Amino acid sequence: MEAFVSRFVDRVTIHVAAGDGGNGCASVHREKYKPLGGPDGGNGGRGGDVRLVVDPGVHTLLDFHHRPHARASNGKQGRGSMRNGAIGEDLVLPVPEGTVVLTPDGEVLADLVGVGTTFVAAQGGRGGLGNAALSSKARRAPGFALLGEPGDEHDLVLELKSVADAGLVGFPSAGKSSLISVLSAAKPKIADYPFTTLVPNLGVVTAGDTVFTVADVPGLIPGASEGRGLGLDFLRHIERCAVLVHVVDCATQEPGRDPLSDVDALEEELARYTPALKTEHGAGDLESRPRLVVLNKMDVPEARELAELVRPELAQRGWPVFEVSTASHEGLRELRFALAEAVEEYRAEQPEPEPARTIVRPVGVDDTGFTVEPDPDYEDAFIVRGDKPERWVRQTHFDNDEAVGFLADRLAKLGVEEALAKNGAKPGSQVTIGSVTFDWEPSTPAGVAGVLGGRGTDLRLDQDERVSAHERKAAKKARRTSLDEEGGYVGE
């Protein structure tokens, strides 16, 4: 039987793969009356990116739970007549606002806040160059093209942190869901047993001209910061809240519980969660967030008596205290406008929102370096590591001798051959670059030796055998004179 999956998912692991670049084309221009038309192979198209885009219509990560693998389309291969391959289509994945992108090790890559904010999760591979782009004065007729590069491939962790202005925190069955249902039009599940709320609920509240959102976080218990109860699963949803609201059950009959001890226990859990919040995500602490205390269930006579006893001590802490009843709606107007005022103060302190931006994974600035080290698994073998050598190897079609020679020229120009010689490599030594292992022969020429001179050059292009009009007339006149002399005719 298939396991039940909640419709609210706030943490998933996905695998993203960008499209591969298309291969370049090696072709020669063919047209009547144009012999040796030269190379005209087009470049391959770039592979498509995988992008995460904040979409206001998406509220959970449920789609990624069912489809954790995402792959963009590949670039198309180049063609003759200078036709470049089509660029692969980007794959756009909508995510809810407040999504945090992390590596499997917990490193934060992006915090997606703001509609339209885009994160390039995987970049498409570059297309290979065609032989037209590879031609030069020294290499006028390349008989090869470069292969397209593979696209990026990553495992990513997506975490959703609700973007709410006020967060309701409290023990299970304190009345948080009932409170959000009367403050807003939200319809959370409400029942008289603990942990009725298993997922955060968001509600939109209007107080005068101010509109703000309130999050109902599942109930906390002592030890939540260490994983007890629902643990850290939902504590992350209060990280972005401007105001924290302690909802206290003044009608509880549980032994050893009272409003003061409940508030102290909640504050202790929040204080324990703050160091983990700073360490893992670099976010600010929760200690400086303004607090409001809501003494709930004032429709019960015993609750009102208890509220009168604890209210002075709570007020001494500098927190506004409100006595409310979700059944009779007592005190809701005052609470609504107090929350609006606190939210407005927080918004006034914040900088102007930035326009939608695109976040790209940082790429190393210097990719020209490389290292040569002995292969620990084999004798007289070496491993070359570096972005450029490994990329060049991926671009090389090893069934083409001229392409292999071009790779050898590039490696020699970069200094790889010199570095191998300094490290003791000899002709025939085994060298590994990326996924390719070959026997090293320094400065080995490649390509067609008969017709071609240097690699990528065609001696026929330098030969000028066409006869000029003057030469044709002179030859015709010479033939006519020869025929006249043979026939004995003498002109005037």
UniProtKB/Swiss-Prot annotation:
Residues 164-344 form the OBG-type G domain. Keywords: Cytoplasm, GTP-binding, Hydrolase, Magnesium, Metal-binding, Nucleotide-binding. Residues 6-163 form the Obg domain. Residues 462-492 are annotated as: Disordered. Mg(2+) binds at S177, T197. One of its GO terms (biological process) is ribosome biogenesis. Its cofactor is Mg(2+). It holds the Pfam family GTP1_OBG. GTP binds at residues 170-177, 195-199, 216-219, 296-299, 325-327. Residues 362-442 form the OCT domain. Its EC number is 3.6.5.-. It is an enzyme of class 3 (hydrolase). It is found in: Cytoplasm. GO terms for cellular component: cytoplasm. InterPro entries: G_OBG (IPR031167), GTP-bd (IPR006073), GTP-bd_Obg/CgtA (IPR014100), GTP-bd_prot_GTP1/OBG_C_sf (IPR036346), GTP1-OBG_CS (IPR006074), GTP1_OBG_dom (IPR006169), GTP1_OBG_dom_sf (IPR036726), OBG_GTPase (IPR045086). Residues 462-472 have a biased composition (Basic and acidic residues). Gene3D superfamilies: GTP-binding protein OBG, C-terminal domain, GTP1/OBG domain, P-loop containing nucleotide triphosphate hydrolases. Monomer. Belongs to the TRAFAC class OBG-HflX-like GTPase superfamily. OBG GTPase family. An essential GTPase which binds GTP, GDP and possibly (p)ppGpp with moderate affinity, with high nucleotide exchange rates and a fairly low GTP hydrolysis rate. Plays a role in control of the cell cycle, stress response, ribosome biogenesis and in those bacteria that undergo differentiation, in morphogenesis control. This is GTPase Obg. It comes from Saccharopolyspora erythraea (strain ATCC 11635 / DSM 40517 / JCM 4748 / NBRC 13426 / NCIMB 8594 / NRRL 2338). The gene is obg.
